[in-house]
Amino acid sequence: MDVEEIKRKKLLELQKKLAEQQQQEEALLEAEMQKRALLRKILTPEARERLERIRLARPEFAEAVEVQLIQLAQLGRLPIPLSDEDFKALLERISALTKRKREIKIVRK
């Protein structure tokens, strides 16, 4: 193997990795766009605004709520479109289920 052949193989490997990475990014973008489209159908504009405000404060919680909303809608267990009031009630139920109990203990010496 000469130096040129090694360089060519290395270049091909890098190009292949780059192409795979671009495909993954495109797939993620496509999935995100589909999720947004579903949420647009599921939620009223006011409820979507509320979800976006939640995303700013707690991104992980917003992601979990989105997944649950989509699953419930696909199972037919949500009124479509979901009003802001119904969305608030759903958020309260989800929050109550996922809320961690925080206990503070003070040890005095």
Curated annotation (Swiss-Prot):
GO molecular function: DNA binding
Superkingdom of source: Archaea
DNA-binding keyword on record: yes
Disulphide connectivity of cysteines: none
GO cellular component: cytosol
Family: Belongs to the PDCD5 family.
Descriptive protein name: DNA-binding protein MJ0691
Organism: Methanocaldococcus jannaschii (strain ATCC 43067 / DSM 2661 / JAL-1 / JCM 10045 / NBRC 100440)
